[in-house]
Amino acid sequence: MAIDENKQKALAAALGQIEKQFGKGSIMRLGEDRSMDVETISTGSLSLDIALGAGGLPMGRIVEIYGPESSGKTTLTLQVIAAAQREGKTCAFIDAEHALDPIYAKKLGVDIDNLLCSQPDTGEQALEICDALTRSGAVDVIIVDSVAALTPKAEIEGEIGDSHMGLAARMMSQAMRKLAGNLKQANTLLIFINQIRMKIGVMFGNPETTTGGNALKFYASVRLDIRRTGAIKEGEEVVGSETRVKVVKNKVAAPFKQAEFQILYGEGINIHGELVDLGVKHKLIEKAGAWYSYNGDKIGQGKANACNFLKENPTISAELDKKLREMLLHKGNELKPAAAGNSHDEDELAGEGKEEF
């Protein structure tokens, strides 16, 4: 239906005034192309990038990564930092747990000389530092480890045993309101690592919940549930862990997909193992008995040897990675303006099917 000409003129004048006052892009039509492109940073895991649909974690958004202890939360975020630094981006790590190991970070490919690090005394201080870094417009990725360690100032100054009901939740709620707009303007990715707690007296459904109240769940564009599903052994020695990540909320692509990969101790995500597995699954790598072949050339007998070949030949690894991304980041992952139910959590939509990569 055509809009009245006078109304069109009035609308154009209003839009012009808004853009003049608040900047270009402060208001736009939803169908415009520029609003649909989402810049992303790789997670360091090919299968997780594919499960996320957009090819990685979205810039200018809030992301929550949660899971049990020793499930790989910090390792995953350090891999994100390493990937961002390789693209020349500036990263900051807010270490509220005071537990960041620079030697381990360096092993995962993090340039520790150029990583900004803060160990704040209180939760308010940590969130103020986040806000200041965001408003500077010079920091591309900020990690907060973890929400559970963001202790309000009143709790630190009080006695052990004092009741501070809802204090952390109020602090997080206020911070989310303040940070969300600034992150979008600065195009900064903010990742919160969170821990799991059990709800008491839950007879039916999932008793697990995350700390810090509900605000983070609502403001996060992506929520990842990371779990350790098994151990990787060489003989009797445990050398890593099998890991599964579920995308329980996704505002930039289809949710409810999951990725499985290996985390090797001292090395991080086994990207070459993912390339072999996905290559075989999607017929880019041929497997005959124990032998693996790529483009007709044998690359190794057994998965370990095939992985070593890819590790020693980065050009072939990059070529295989590119082919898999082009093949698997397909039409179904494109943003749709009216994707109903796209941002709900897994808890709310129990029984949804998950696509695995």
Swiss-Prot record:
The keyword DNA-binding applies. The keyword Metal-binding does not apply. The gene is recA. PANTHER family: MITOCHONDRIAL DNA REPAIR PROTEIN RECA HOMOLOG-RELATED, RECA. This is Protein RecA. It is found in: Cytoplasm. It comes from Pectobacterium atrosepticum (strain SCRI 1043 / ATCC BAA-672). Belongs to the RecA family. GO terms for cellular component: cytosol. It comes from the Bacteria. SUPFAM superfamilies: P-loop containing nucleoside triphosphate hydrolases, RecA protein, C-terminal domain. One of its GO terms (biological process) is DNA repair. Keywords: ATP-binding, Cytoplasm, DNA damage, DNA recombination, DNA repair, DNA-binding, Nucleotide-binding, SOS response. Can catalyze the hydrolysis of ATP in the presence of single-stranded DNA, the ATP-dependent uptake of single-stranded DNA by duplex DNA, and the ATP-dependent hybridization of homologous single-stranded DNAs. It interacts with LexA causing its activation and leading to its autocatalytic cleavage. One of its GO terms (molecular function) is ATP hydrolysis activity. Residues 334-357 are annotated as: Disordered. ATP binds at G67, P68, E69, S70, S71, G72, K73, T74. SMART domains: AAA. Its main location: cytoplasm. InterPro entries: AAA+_ATPase, DNA_recomb/repair_RecA, DNA_recomb/repair_RecA_CS, P-loop_NTPase, RecA-like_C, RecA-like_N, RecA_ATP-bd, RecA_C_sf.
